[in-house]
Amino acid sequence: MDEAAGPSTSRTSNLEDVDDEGASLAEEDEEHTKALKAKEMMAPLFQRYNFTMKKNDLPINWNKPEILDKIRSNAVVVLQGATGCGKTTQVPQYLLEEAFERKEYCNIIVTQPRKIAAISIARRVAQERKCDLGTLVGYKVGLKEQHNEDTRLLYVTTGVLLQSLINSKTMATYTHVILDEVHEREVDMDFLLIVVRRLLSTNSKKTKVILMSATIDAKGFSEYFKIPKKSGYLSAPVISVERPRLHVVQEFYFDDLEKLKVDFQIDYEAPGISEQMYNIAAKLVVVCDHLKGQEFGDSLEYKPSIIIFLPGINEIEKMEGALEKLIASIQNAAQRPNLLIMKLHSTLPADDQTAVFRKPGPNQRKVILSTNIAESSITVPDIKFVIDFCLQRILVTDTLTNFSTLRTEWASKSNCIQRAGRAGRLMSGRVYRLVDRRFFENNMDVSTSPEILRCPLETVVLKAKLLEMGTPPSILALAMAPPNLDDIRNTILLLKEVGAMLRTVKGNYDQLDGDLTYLGRIMSKLPLDIRISKLIMLGYIFSVMEEAVTIGAGMNVKNIFLNQNSVKTYSQKMYWADGSGSDAIAILNAYTAWKSRQEQAGDTADMYNWARRMSLDRKSLIDMAELIHEVKDRLNRSGLKPVSGPNRVVWNAREKTVILKVILAGAFYPNYFIPMSVGGKELMERQSFTELGGRDPCNTVFFTGFDHERYIGPLYTVQIKKILSEGDYSKHQAMKVMYDRTTNRIFVTFLGTTDERDQRGSFMPGKVHADVYRAIKLRKLGARNRITEIRTMRQRDAIDYATSAGLGHWEDANGWVPRRKIVRNAHLSVLPPIFREKVVCQVTHVVHPNKFFLRPEDNRNKDIFREIHTQLNARQLHPFPADANFAMGQMVAAPVQENQETYARAVLRSYRNVRTTGSVSWTVFFIDYGHTAAMEETAFRQLDDSLGQLKDIPPRAFEATLTEIQPSAIISPQGSWTTESIHRFKELVLGKIFVAKVYSVVGVVASVELSRDEIRMNSELIRLKYAQYAEESYISKLDHDHRERKQREIMMDENLRNEVYRSAELTQNTYEDDELEDVNPPEDKLRCKVVLSGPHSPLETSASATIRSSVMKPVSIESDSVNSILLDSNPQDTHEKLLVAGGVNEQGNRLVLRQTSVMPNIPGFGAIMSLIFCPTAQLKKDKDETRVVTVLSGLGYDPSTGEALYPEHDMALTLDVVLNDDDITNINALRYTMDSILHTGEGQTDPKFGDASIQKLKLQVKQYIIKILEHERRFLDLRHAPNDYNWRCDLNLTAGSSSSKKMKGDFNIYDKKAIFPLLEPLNLLPVSASQLTFLKKHCHELHKLAHTDVQLPRHGITCQLCNNVLETLPQLRIHLYSKLHRDRESQIKYRSPQMY
C-alpha cells in the first residue's frame, strides 16, 4: 500500500511544524502558541480559496448545526444517513467552513472503499467549492493522486489511510479523520477501526473521528468507540439524517401473493431457489407488465423496467429460462408480454453492463436479471418494479484448507433495503420480496457479517505485524468483530508456509506468531493476493520479474477474457495460451499483444473491435495496465526492479516458458494436482486401443448410440461434420468420419496440420490434436442444447438413396454392405513388411523427427522409382481441360517444386478458393517424396494413356517416426519440435542414406531407429538436448511384439520364411472405402431424429489433489480455463504429470480449480518443484532404505511433540523417478541461493546483499535450475511408504539432526531465519545381494515366460521389479518393452536375453 496518504510536507502547511516549534515553550503557553501558528499557516489559504458555499437543499443541511456541535464536543461521532442524503460531500465542507469562520487549522482526510468513488467525489466537491482539483481539495488512490501543499480536504481509499497510519503510527497530522461507508465492513475498514481506536487512546487524542454509515443500525459503531468516564463508559453519539422519499414505493411479501402461489412453502433452512419459485417470479413479471402505469403517475415515454435480484450467474440463467418458457406458453398474442431480458453481473464485459441503461423498444419492457452488483455499484434510474429473492452469495474462506466457497445465504435487511432503493427514483414503484413478511422482520440479519469473519486474513495479519503493537491475535482481538482465534492461527500457519513469516519469534517457535520476513514485508506493500506477490518475488529471483508482474496483475483483476461459454472463446483461450496449457501464460500473451496494438492504434473503434474479436475484455485490460504500473512503482520504491546490463540473466523465449511455470509452481505451492486416469496409464492405453478400434486416440473422438442395422452411416457424414465444425464448412475436409457396425459407434479422425507449429495457433501441449479438445468442449457446452441430434432417413428411402449414390449395396443376409476399394500391386508397397527388421533408405522429406519420409534403396525399389520418374519426365504431359472437375484423392502429375519442369505423382488432399484470382488452390501430396505443396489447378497434368498404369503403383516413400523420442520439455515446453531442432535434424539426415531398424508399423507409419556411420540418430538428438525419451504407444508395442516373434519364427523355420516371402509377393488387399465424397440427402427425406452420445475421447482424465485435507475430494476445473478440458496429452508417457492451480474454490465437497497451468512434461517434475519450494520436506524411504519412495513436504512438525504443524497442507508425492544425491545437492544449492537473495541482516528490513552480489546470485539460480531440470532421471515403480503423512516415522531425516548439520556445514548460516532451509541427505543403503539375486532370477523367469504361449494364472502375475500386475501374456511382453521395466533392469544390472 502507499506509504503516505497526506499532502507533501511543507513548512507552511503541516501541523507537525507547530508541534516542533512549540515543544520548547512552557506547557501553559503551548496551546496559545499552536493557535497562533495555525492561524498564520491557514491565513494564505483563507485568502486564496473560497471557504463559503451556497446552501443547497440536501437533507443533511437540516442537521448541520447538530453535526458541527457534536464533532466539536466529542472525539468520535457516528453519522447515519441513507445513500444520497449528502453526508459524503457536505460534512467535510462543513468542517472547512467552520475552520475558516474560527480561523483554525484544519487537515481533513476522508476514506472511500473504492478508488472510483474517491476520485469522483473529490472532483465533485472541488467543483462545488469552485477550486481546481488537486488544490484545496484533492485525492490519492493507488498511484493516482492530485493534491499539493494547499490541500486541506483529501479523499483517499481505505487502504491508503491504513498504510499511512501503519507507517507513521499517529493520526496527529490530521484534525479530522472521516471514515465513510463503514457499514460495508470490509477487511481494511475493520482493521482501520482497530488502528484508529488505538491511536485515539495514545498519541492522537486531539484528532476528531467521524464514522459515516448508510445502515439502519449504527449502534455497534457507537458502542465500539466508548469513552471511559468516571461514571462508566460513554458511547459515541449517533446523528441520524432522514431522507424523505420523493416517490412512494410499496412493499409486498411472498405471503401477499395469494393469486400467484401454488401450494408451496419456502424452506428457510436451505437458502436457494426452487423450480416453483422461478415460475412464481416469472408469473410476477407478467403481472407487473400488465399493471397500468397511470396508477403510479408515470411520466416516462417508454415502459419502465423490472429488476430481479438473484444470487448468482447460474440462477440468472435459470430465471431467463423460466421467463422464456412462460412467455412461449401464452397462446394469446395480445396477452403475451414483449420483454427485453438483460443480464447484469460482474463477469460481463463493461460494454455489456452498460447495455442495461439503453431504452427499450416501442411497447417493450426491460427485465434486468441482476446479482447484487445493482445494489450500489450500478444504478439504473428507470426501474419501477423490484423482485427480490432476498438471497446473496458470499465468499467464505476455510482458513484450515485456504479454500474459498461461494455460499448462498439469506441477504441482510440492509441489503434488501438498498435493493428496494433501486425503485422510486423517477416514479412510484413496487418491491416484491419473495420471503414471508414474518421471516423478513424476525429472522433475517440486520446486516451482512463483516468480511473479517469470513474472508482471508493474510493481509490483516501482515499489517498487524507491521503495526508492532503486539502479536497478531492480541491486535485482532480488539476488532469490532474479532476473528476466531483458530482462523488467526491457521492464517499464521499459511503465512509461514508462503515464507511471509518465520516459524519462530527471535529464534523460539511460536504457534501464534512469527518474525516477519523480507518477503512478508514486500507482500504487505503490494495490493495483491500474497501468493501473487510471491510469484512476483520469485520472478525477481529467477529473472522474469517483468512477466511475473504482468501475470500477477492479470490474475488479480477481473477476467480479461470474455466468458461467452462457446467453443470459439475456448479456441481463443487456446490461441492466447500458445500451446502452453497455462491460463497464466495466456494472460501474459494476451496483454502483451493488446499493449503493443494499443500503442500503435490508440483507443480507437478498430481497437475495440479487435478486442471483441479476440475475446478480450477491454475494460479489464485497462485496469490491468493501471495495476501493473502501480505494482512496478511500489517495487521500484522497495529497490526491486529488473536488472539491465551485460551481466544480467537472459532467457530465450522457450526457456522463459519453462521458468514461468517453475515460478508458478513455487508461488502456488501446495495447489498441486495430479491428472489421473482410472486404473492407471497402462490400462488407459489398452482401453483407448479397444474403444477406438486401434485408431489413434490423439486425433480421434467417437459417438455412441448409432444403430448401424437401422441407419446407413455415410448418408449422415455431413451432419456429423457440421456438429463438430459448428457450421464452418471449411473444416469438413480436415475430418474423416468412419462407422463401426460391430460397436454402433461413429469415429471422427481430425486430419490437418498439427505438425507445423512454428506459427502461433490454437493447440495444447503434447500430442493430442486441438480439435479433439474442441470436440469435448462442444459436448460439455452443448449437453443442455442436444447438439448431437441428427436427422435420418427411413430405412427404405436410405437404401435407395445410398445405392443410387454408389455408396454400397444391400444384401438380405448381411444388410448394408459398404463399397470396398482394391489395393492394386500391394506386393510393391514400400512399407516395411512384418518379416523385415531393417531397411536401407534415403530420407526424402523431413517435417520433424517424429514425421519424415523414407524411400527404400534396394535395387527393385530404385528401379521402380526410376521408371516412374522417366515416364513422367520423358514426354510432354497434357494439361487438364479448362472445365475439368477435380476430386479429393485424385492422382495427377504435378511439378515437384515451383518453377521446375520435373513432374511427380501427386494426390489431391484439400482445396480452397482463392479470392483474389477466383481460381482454386489445392494442397497436393507427393506420394514418392512425402512433401506437400499448394498449387493451382493449371499446374496439374494428366496421367492418361500409357501413364494410367502409374495410378496403380503404391507410393515409393513411406512415413516414419524416430522410435522412443519426443521433443525435449526444456527447450520445447509446448511439446512441439523447435525450428532449431528441425533444422539440425534436416542437416543430419535429409537426402542421406540410413539403415532404418523397424520397431513397429502402425497404420502407414513406421517407427524406426536411424543409423549411419555408427551414429544412432535417436540417441544423437537426445545427446544434443533436442529430444528426450518417450514411451512407445500401446499399439506400437503390440506390433513390435508381433514383429519380433514373427521374425524369430521365420529365422528358425526356413520353410515358413519362404512361405511368408512368397505370400508377400501375391498380396492383393481390399478395404472399406473411407474416402467417399460427402453426400447430403434432401431435407424432405430426413424425417427421423437420432440423439447421439458424444463426442467422447478415451483420453479424458480428472485431477486429484495432493494435500492431506483434499486427497479424497473430487476435482474439476473452471469452465473458462484453457484446461477445462483435461486430456492425457502424452498418453504413451507413464510418469505422473502436474497441474498447478492459482486458486481453489470449494463447491460442496468438490474442489474447483482456477487459473491452472499444465507443468512441463518432465519426469518427476512435481516432486522436484515440491522439494525446491516447500517450507521443509522429509524424504521417505522404502522398508529396506534403498530408495526414496515418497516426498513429504509441508511446515514440518513440532519438535517437542512430533505433531505436524499444519497437517491439512502436508503433501505426500509418490516418486516415479530415481532421486539421488546429485538432485538433493543441486536443490539445496538453489534453496540456499534463493534464501541469500531474500536474506536481511540482523535488525534490518532490507536485503543484506547489494545489487552486484544479488546479480551474481541470480546467475547461480539460473545455473542450478537448468542443472536440476536437465538431469535425466531413471523411472521407478510407484510404491508408498508406511504412514506417508507421518512426520515422526523417520526422525533421522528431520531438520536439525546431527547428520543434517554435518552435511550442511558452513551453508547452514541462516539457521532458523531461512525461508528455504536445506533438505536432509538421502543416506540410502545398497540393495542387498540376496535381493539382487532374487530380482535378477525373477526377471529371467519373466523373459522366459514371454517366449511361451502359456496362459497366465487367473489373477495374473506381478512383476516384482516394477510392482505391476500383468494379467495376460501380451501385457507381459509389452511391459518388458516399457522404459520403466528396462530402467529397473538397468538399476539391478540385469542384462536381458535377446528379445523374442
UniProtKB/Swiss-Prot annotation:
Residues 885-950 form the Tudor domain. Keywords: ATP-binding, Cytoplasm, Developmental protein, Differentiation, Helicase, Hydrolase, Meiosis, Nucleotide-binding, RNA-mediated gene silencing, Spermatogenesis. It catalyses: ATP + H2O = ADP + phosphate + H(+). The keyword Cytoplasm applies. The keyword ATP-binding applies. GO terms for molecular function: ATP binding; ATP hydrolysis activity; RNA binding; RNA helicase activity. Residues 68-234 form the Helicase ATP-binding domain. GO terms for cellular component: cytoplasm. A motif (DEAH box) lies at residues 180-183. PANTHER family: ATP-DEPENDENT RNA HELICASE, ATP-DEPENDENT RNA HELICASE TDRD9. Belongs to the DEAD box helicase family. DEAH subfamily. This is Probable ATP-dependent RNA helicase spindle-E. The gene is spn-E.
